[in-house]
């Protein structure tokens, strides 16, 4: 079986996760399809537990950021801060990002195009040493290999 990730659909939702997951479960019952959800914590513990209860299904993996948002987790993962600081200074001409908090705050305020550019550049030499935050890596591993 080929476990490469090459047929992925990405959808972004602000609210309504549970309804969408319930519909997805009905539509995909008995298929080999998988649903991986990466969500921001946003200081909402109840929402986190409501969504992560879907991890009981063998074809769903929900993972939540440790910190408030995705940007916070990316910047604070292992040695990512220095790599990202260099990247954003060179590629986006950002200044005043000399601490992890300043960098993640600026990134959160940036337009969606900045996140798109970053995602497209993840395979570039400039970002080859970036470590995915654990919650993202967990979902990627699930999508490739299933539950562990």
Where would I find each of the regions flagged by the language model?
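Acidic, divalent-metal-binding catalytic cores of TOPRIM
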Residues: 1-148
């Amino acid at each position: 079986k080929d476990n490469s990730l090459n047929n992925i659909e990405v959808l972004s939702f602000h609210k309504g996760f549970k309804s969408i997951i319930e519909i997805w479960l009905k539509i995909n019952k008995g298929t080999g399809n998988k649903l991986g959800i990466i969500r921001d914590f946003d200081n909402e513990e109840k929402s986190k537990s409501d969504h992560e209860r879907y991890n009981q299904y063998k074809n769903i993996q929900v993972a939540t950021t440790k910190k408030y948002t995705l940007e916070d987790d990316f910047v604070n993962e292992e040695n990512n801060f220095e790599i990202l600081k260099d990247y954003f200074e060179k590629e986006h001409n950002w200044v005043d990002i000399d601490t992890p908090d300043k960098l993640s705050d600026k990134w959160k305020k940036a337009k969606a195009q900045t996140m798109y550019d970053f995602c497209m550049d993840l395979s570039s030499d400039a970002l080859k040493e970036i470590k995915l935050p654990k919650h993202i890596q967990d979902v990627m591993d699930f999508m490739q290999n299933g539950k562990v």
